[in-house]
């Protein structure tokens, strides 16, 4: 897998699909979101051009696992049409992330907490899990940011905010491969997203979490 690490000023990660419930039959972009203090749950916005966005003005799913919050929701549609959703389920202290699935974006089932970092009990956080489907291996890849104190050189950040990217893979969201280190760029990093541009051409977009810039 060839990857390029890009730093850009801003990025919005969107999923192109049909917006359920809209009167138009045109394809649209769907934007997953949440409102602070992150206790309401999944919110969605849609756009036909990627520039002008309309809030669907409702909560589609309220989490009940982990610390019962939803931040950083990431959603992908699988080959069978099922929507898979993962999210940050706790600010600090949770050793995993939340998961649920849906066929129509309205009715969600199989909600659970996935304790991907349970084998590292000193882990401070599991933030911003991002989904990617690898059609070549027919597996879902989930990447996220975690801090394990004293695991890496501290650099500019405090020890409890020295983030690195980790990952797991799954075919069915029932069993998950043991979590492994995905990326150590030598500085604190969060909010990474995998984008496939062409066959064997992948891009990794990430946030340099080093203060004060915190650049993408």
Residues of each region from the PLM?
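Bacterial N-terminal signal peptides
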Residues: 9-20
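Beta-rich carbohydrate-recognition and catalytic domains
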Residues: 22-126, 132-216
């Amino acid at each position: 897998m060839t990857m390029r690490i890009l730093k850009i000023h801003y990025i919005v990660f969107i999923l192109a699909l049909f917006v359920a419930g809209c009167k138009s039959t045109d394809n649209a972009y769907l934007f997953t979101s949440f409102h602070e203090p992150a206790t309401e749950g999944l919110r969605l916005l849609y756009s036909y051009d990627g520039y002008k966005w309309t809030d669907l003005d409702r909560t589609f799913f309220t989490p009940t696992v982990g610390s019962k919050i939803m931040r950083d929701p990431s959603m992908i549609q699988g080959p069978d049409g099922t929507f898979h959703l993962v999210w940050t389920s706790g600010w600090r202290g949770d050793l995993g992330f939340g998961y649920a699935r849906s066929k129509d974006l309205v009715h969600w089932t199989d909600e659970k907490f996935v304790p991907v970092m349970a084998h590292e009990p000193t882990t401070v956080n599991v933030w911003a899990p991002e989904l990617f489907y690898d059609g070549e291996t027919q597996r879902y890849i989930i990447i996220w940011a975690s801090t394990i104190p004293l695991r890496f050189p501290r650099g500019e950040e405090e020890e409890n905010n020295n983030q690195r990217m980790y990952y797991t893979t799954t075919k069915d969201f029932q069993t998950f491969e043991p979590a492994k280190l995905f990326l150590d760029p030598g500085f604190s990093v969060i909010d990474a997203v995998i984008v496939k541009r062409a066959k064997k051409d992948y891009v990794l977009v990430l946030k340099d979490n080093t203060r004060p810039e915190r650049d993408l």
